[in-house]
């Protein structure tokens, strides 16, 4: 049973929408920070590398309606389909393209050059340095000269309890005490039990990559990006970074 869960964690979550319903508020806050840090411009082109169920679209919808061009890419059919469906629900399907691809394989978007590439909790699932290096080379190959790479990856301090604590606080501030009570006692116990603790276990076993600040910064630099910003997010359980491609 545990082996099945490990192999099908993402696909089951995307297909059932459990991933959407159980995601903690702190996770959404990290997405909001990513969107707030994007450059201005209505014609911006953005690749969401490892788009999952397309949750980032919730926070990009207004920008997309104003002219942003969005491409979502995920390894799983269930993620690609969920992203397409979300784009329909948000009324932005005509400006959203979805493709299926592995980050560590040549990307099927080589005719497009993106202003921004976002990897929100995606590259860390490639545990080996070599695979992540190859994935970053792939992403760099589809970016505009001096394009921006925006990454969010878990840190060595990943802590399921702190993520839940911060999420309850954020929900209370944003939606009031009744919603916070509902999340605390009826939603977040499942979030922690079948989501966050599983991820924490994968990180501690080295199956997925957890970063120190130095490792996170160095991965940008080794891939040919000048680091412009690094910040702890997700209750101190992840790093958000922005790097600009260094002109040759």
Where are these regions (language model features)?
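A short acidic, Gly/Pro-enriched loop at the edge of an enzyme's catalytic core
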Residues: 108-117
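Conserved class I S-adenosyl-L-methionine
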Residues: 1-40, 55-59, 150-179
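Conserved SAM-binding strand-loop segment of SAM-dependent methyltransferases
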Residues: 91-105
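Short alpha-helix
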Residues: 207-223
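A short glycine-rich, Lys/Arg-flanked "PGG" loop and its adjoining helix->strand segment in the class I
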Residues: 133-145
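Conserved SAM/SAH-binding beta-strand->alpha-helix loop
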Residues: 76
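Conserved SAM-binding loop
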Residues: 83-84
């Amino acid at each position: 049973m545990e082996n099945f869960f490990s192999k099908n964690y993402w696909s089951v979550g995307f297909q059932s929408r459990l991933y959407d319903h159980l995601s903690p508020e702190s996770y959404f806050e990290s997405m909001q920070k990513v969107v707030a840090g994007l450059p201005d411009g209505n014609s911006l082109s953005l690749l969401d590398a490892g788009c999952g169920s397309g949750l980032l679209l919730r926070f990009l919808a207004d920008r997309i309606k104003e002219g942003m061009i969005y491409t979502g890419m995920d390894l799983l059919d269930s993620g690609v389909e969920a992203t397409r469906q979300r784009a329909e629900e948000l009324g932005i399907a005509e400006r959203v393209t979805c493709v299926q691809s592995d980050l560590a394989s040549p990307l099927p978007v080589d005719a497009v050059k993106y202003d921004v590439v976002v990897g929100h909790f995606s590259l860390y699932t490639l545990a080996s340095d070599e695979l992540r290096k190859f994935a970053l080379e792939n992403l760099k190959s589809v970016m505009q000269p001096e394009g921006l790479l925006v990454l969010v990856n878990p840190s060595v301090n990943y802590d399921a309890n702190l993520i839940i604590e911060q999420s309850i606080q954020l929900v209370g501030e944003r939606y009031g005490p009744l919603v916070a009570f509902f999340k605390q006692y009826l939603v977040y116990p499942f979030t922690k039990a079948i989501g966050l603790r599983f991820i924490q276990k994968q990180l501690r076993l080295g199956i997925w990559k957890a970063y120190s600040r130095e490792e996170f910064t160095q991965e940008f630099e080794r891939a040919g990006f000048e680091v412009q910003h690094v910040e702890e997010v997700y209750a101190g359980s992840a790093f958000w970074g922005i790097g600009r491609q260094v002109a040759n």
